[in-house]
Amino acid sequence: MKEHQHRGLTSAQVEESRRLHGDNLITPRKGDSAWKLFAEKFRDPIIQVLLVAALLSLAMAFIDGEFLETIGIICAIVLATCVGFFFELDAMRRFKRLNLVNDDIPVKVVRDGEMTEVPRRDVVVGDLVYVENGETVPADGKLVKAVSLKINESTLTGEPEVDKTTDERSFDAEATYPSDALSRGTTVVDGDGEMIGEAVGDRTEAGRVTEQSSIASEEPTPLYKQLTRLSRMIGKIGIAVSIAIFVAMLAKAYLGGELSTGDWVQTSKELLRIFMVSVALIVMAVPEGLPMSITLSLALSMRRMLKTNNLVRKMHACETMGAVTVICTDKTGTLTQNRMRVEEIIHYASIDERLLAEIIAVNSTAFLDADANVIGNPTEGALLIRLREEGFDYAALREEAPIVDRMTFTTERKYMATIIQSKTTGKRLICVKGAPEIVRAMCMPDGKDAQVNEQLLLFQGRAMRTLAVAYAETTAERCEDALRDPQMLFVAVAAIADPVREDVPAAVARCMKAGIDIKIVTGDTPATAREIARRIGLWHDETDSSRNEMTGVEFAAMSDEELLERVQALKIMSRARPLDKQRLVRLLQRKGEIVAVTGDGTNDAPALNFANVGLSMGSGTSVAKDASDITLLDDSFTSIASAVMWGRSLYRNIQRFVLFQLTINFAAIIVVFVGSIFGTEMPLTVVQILWVNIIMDTFAALAMASLPPNPAVMNEPPRPKDEFIITPAMARTIFTCGTIFVGVLLGMLFYWRATTGELSLEQLTVFFSVFVFLQFWNMFNAKGFEACHSVLHDLRGSRTFFLVLLLIAVGQVLIVEFGGPVFRTTPLTWVQWLEVIGYTSLIAIMGDVVRSIRRRISPRPGCR
């Protein structure tokens, strides 16, 4: 066992364990079956009304022997429900695939004698697993080492903090789980430890008693709610108009004698026809596709955003990112490369080199793998790399100096302390490293304050992170006791460089051009933070002053009323603590800002929760990730800028779908209403209307959701969070295009009535095709809404859009040419097809011309 604790499993043992005990995956809870989801579609009130109409039509078909229209209605209903079911099922599967990313979280294990990181799914029974503050326990296991280890078991027992130890004398006999046992899904709230995996996957306690959590939020997004209300409002209008049309057509039939023929079969057929027309109009008028467009757009966007290193954990974050006005960002790893390197170590006390190496090695929780890659905190890793370069084996130093107690680093205390039994001195030592001003306050006076401060300012002016190291002899068992009256020796200061990411200055410029304020909230010193801000283009010595920066201490000392006057101008908060970040978020929100916040530590969870969008780091703790809405897999600020672009583009695409659908709703309701009032019956059959409805709801939603993000949206200011989705420009477009559609369609009907009397089958077929192709070309107008280029721009990036259009066009031609009595159509000549397509295309051509003229006369901010 002792050898195993040091060496871990071999590669062969890992494979054998996986064969015997399986993967570390919890089987997802069994969701609704595909059949149940399909059946759910028939609970829609609109579908139920259609089914009633279909049954009545079937009854009449048995009487007169004409089944074609009934078959067409039933097929159309099934097609409509199948298409909706398919897209809902596809979206659900996409969300499930995103959930699997949770099992790719890296876990530190020892294999073949080397510390390495593997995905959580690859942890096996027998693995030697290392866990530390903020991490989630990946499997059930037994502790073999514990240093000040505290576990949050609230997911299993409700206990937020349970002490864990390997010392049997300290075991809690009343604990729910043994004091040396760790359970999958619990989190480390303090300390660190090593355990041997005893159960993985479904055999863990979590696998038996809990259900797998889902990334997809059950709470509807604000935009979904807005569109649902809009859909219901328009639906009520459509139902009211349908009732009015039913009454008007009923009165017309009664006055025309169609209901008083004495033939009950004929009378029933006429009543059924009137009823079917009214029902069909309700189907067309109710824009039930609006809420579905949100789900579809979010599903597609979440998958695409994953490719740009944005893992969306909560659906609302996609749309909210588009409204963000302030980004509060960390410095390390987000703005910088997080590739720490010790540039220089300044010694302030003469001690043995091995003792300094021992102090650095044991007072750390980081590791180096076989390739010298850092596992754990990058700053601590840089110190270990420096030890290796100087010829010291940090692992051997740790092994030879047993740990008595440890106080882990937190952003509140800004230091880490460890009590060891030193082999170098043969005595018990308390070792401390952390922020120089904090560590120096623990040390004995040495008359070097001015020298130390001068050197620190030089390092900070070069944007370097600084860590101080100190130690003292002690007899205490606990760090808290040893630090009550510390008289430590101030040994050295390490200057650690972390270059700015090359892509960050451009990303910051993009966000600032998009009207988004950037605020650096960091635990580093003011000088270091200011230099980083200068390098990324956020800080300008000519225009910025002390009003644009403050420390966490200054921030905490001010009242909310005082801060409300300064928070919007603030660019840098240095030496900040997590509660400072949370308070800053709340103050900014009180000023009406939409705030996105980055965080990677357990203590960042409150700020991530309170922010409108919480952005956790891929390298951050599990607690931070669980509290966030989006995880930046590459930790980069550039990914934040990409998320903003995605959010704005998503909102714009949904607006385009709303524009498209409401234009058709407007035209359809007016045409049928006016037609019925003036005695012109509805020239579209129920089956035709259902086909049109499929185009309006499903195909259009897919087409608009598939449009690629437009970088030009980053040249515009943020939209108000509570902005109504139908803007004045959209309302004007809906009214203008809808009026043109009404004029064209009613003009055709009245012209034919005046010249030929009754409408022929050929005329009805042409009318049906014109109606569909007006929608076809109007999709181009919707695509061009608020665009900076012609609708034909970026054909390659809009492949799905054009494929959907092709599907609609081919479907319409096939229906007309081969639909026959079922769709009440007759084949058209190629000349007629050219006329239909050519004349209706004018709506797209003229729309593009008008938009082009407007762009020249009054360029939009995003297109300049």
Q: What is the role of each PLM region?
A:
Residues 760-764:
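Transmembrane alpha-helix entry/boundary detector in multi-pass membrane proteins
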